[in-house]
């Protein structure tokens, strides 16, 4: 159980453990309406390739049940719906009501409403029965969770035996010379894009800082295996700017 007295990081700041969740909620409430446009601008559209790659490696089949955790505006959910078909189900879960509404409205506007459930829930204490899902995806959400170990334990609990966990997240660049360039872009350009497009420089400053504070590829791999998942491996995408971790519950 989480020690409620300790502190944690919010970007580069040290905050009370209980305060981080509130601050992260404020960030995503602020960015929700511009979330998709900002993702396109910040990544030059490459985030769509990362997400498609993730779903291709999911090997989700018709009839299966999938949890898209921190599903936000629904990018992964849309792709997963094509995989599970009419006999399957995708649950789009997010702790943030504003992001959940954006995802629901966007998918409804695209005519996607069958076999989707929307659930507001905390990754650290998922409101689902044990052994519920064939696959759990989490795209760009884990770094915002206060207690990552507790969240991973919760994911393990609700994953079916034989099921798969897929965590797509910003990570540590591995190409020589890429990290200083990426750092410069993250701290000098991203907040300015946030300021001019979304009138919200502070939230995108947090984004850059949260990426730097997130565990690197090997550390996250060890964290995933520590809660019980096995055969964890990862794929570095765009030189390690993003990593896709895949693990199994046997």
Curated annotation (Swiss-Prot):
| Residues annotated as binding S-adenosyl-L-methionine | 73, 94, 122-123
- Which CDD domains does the entry link to? AdoMet_MTases
Entry keyword Methyltransferase: yes
Q: Name one Pfam family in it.
A: Ubie_methyltran
GO MF terms held by the record:
2-methoxy-6-polyprenyl-1,4-benzoquinol methyltransferase activity; demethylmenaquinone methyltransferase activity
Swiss-Prot/TrEMBL keywords: Menaquinone biosynthesis, Methyltransferase, S-adenosyl-L-methionine, Transferase, Ubiquinone biosynthesis
Reactions performed catalytically: a 2-demethylmenaquinol + S-adenosyl-L-methionine = a menaquinol + S-adenosyl-L-homocysteine + H(+); a 2-methoxy-6-(all-trans-polyprenyl)benzene-1,4-diol + S-adenosyl-L-methionine = a 5-methoxy-2-methyl-3-(all-trans-polyprenyl)benzene-1,4-diol + S-adenosyl-L-homocysteine + H(+)
Q: What is its EC number?
A: 2.1.1.163, 2.1.1.201
- Biological or metabolic pathway of the protein: Quinol/quinone metabolism; menaquinone biosynthesis; menaquinol from 1,4-dihydroxy-2-naphthoate: step 2/2; Cofactor biosynthesis; ubiquinone biosynthesis
Biological processes, Gene Ontology terms: aerobic respiration; menaquinone biosynthetic process; methylation
Q: Mind telling me which SUPFAM superfamilies this protein's record contains?
A: S-adenosyl-L-methionine-dependent methyltransferases (SSF53335)
Regions that span the bilayer: none
Query: Is Transferase one of the keywords UniProt gives this record?
Result: yes
As for what it does, the entry says:
Methyltransferase required for the conversion of demethylmenaquinol (DMKH2) to menaquinol (MKH2) and the conversion of 2-polyprenyl-6-methoxy-1,4-benzoquinol (DDMQH2) to 2-polyprenyl-3-methyl-6-methoxy-1,4-benzoquinol (DMQH2).
Q: Which family does it belong to?
A: Belongs to the class I-like SAM-binding methyltransferase superfamily. MenG/UbiE family.
- HAMAP family per UniProt: MenG_UbiE_methyltr
Recorded protein name is Ubiquinone/menaquinone biosynthesis C-methyltransferase UbiE
Organism from which the protein derives: Legionella pneumophila subsp. pneumophila (strain Philadelphia 1 / ATCC 33152 / DSM 7513)
